[in-house]
């Protein structure tokens, strides 16, 4: 299923604290639901997947949502290719902050539109200014129907305003979890086919389908097949 080389896609998960960014990421990569809220600073995962019949490697960066990590977030955005913007349908305040995260993505990507902008960074992280940044807006916790504060229609309207894709998802029931990430990959793949971005390739890894290859100070989560290096 996997050839001699795998194409790498670097995705970054952004959103307010407590909206379920970690739960979505772990559900995607390890197929496990994390019940407890354990604030993240920066966790990275890799998972080998097949999307539309093509094998690839996803590198997913789960990030902190707190305001004090704004400077770090610039670097995370700079290194990312596609983004999953998450709010909770049961939290109006997390929905209201989405525009702030989206603005930060646009600001950072505009400043890194040429490799010379940041000599210390990889030129592959630079963006083509003519190509839109692939973003998926995700209304998480769709299983919490009785606690809903943000309607599906509001989610669609915001996505149209921001010019990005939208879905509601539930990390708990795994509803639309793959869609949230895979649709970003499909956007990136289309851009690469059109010559708007440069593919990243990496040599074949071991037999592990999923890896957590860097962690924070709070690594005590069930990991399933996860390999820590």
Swiss-Prot record:
EC number from the UniProt entry:
3.6.5.2
Record-level Gene Ontology MF annotations: G protein activity; GDP binding; GTP binding; GTPase activity
SMART domains, alphabetically? Answer: RAB, RAN, RAS, RHO
Q: Where do Basic residues bias regions lie? A: 220-229
Motif Effector region positions after renumbering to this chain: 37-45
* Keyword field: Cell membrane, GTP-binding, Hydrolase, Lipoprotein, Membrane, Methylation, Nucleotide-binding, Prenylation
Where is this gene product found? Cell membrane
Q: Give the membrane topology.
A: Lipid-anchor
Residues noted as binding GTP in the record, renumbered to the chain:
15-22, 62-66, 140-143
Could you tell me which residues belong to the region Disordered? Answer: 109-132, 188-229
**Pfam families with a match to the protein in the record:** Ras
Listed under GO cellular component are: plasma membrane
Q: In terms of domain of life, where is this protein from?
A: Eukaryota
Single GO BP term: signal transduction
Quote the catalytic activity from the record. Answer: GTP + H2O = GDP + phosphate + H(+)
> Where are stretches of biased composition, namely Low complexity?
111-126
Record carries keyword Nucleotidyltransferase: no
List, as start-end ranges, the regions of compositional bias called Basic and acidic residues: 209-219
Q: Which residues carry this modification: Cysteine methyl ester?
A: 226
Which InterPro entries does the entry mention?
P-loop_NTPase, Small_GTP-bd, Small_GTPase, Small_GTPase_Ras-type
What is the recorded function of this protein according to its Swiss-Prot or TrEMBL entry?
Ras proteins bind GDP/GTP and possess intrinsic GTPase activity.
Q: Which family is annotated? A: Belongs to the small GTPase superfamily. Ras family.
Please give the name of this protein: Protein ras-2
Species annotation: Neurospora crassa (strain ATCC 24698 / 74-OR23-1A / CBS 708.71 / DSM 1257 / FGSC 987)
Q: Name the gene that codes for it.
A: ras-2
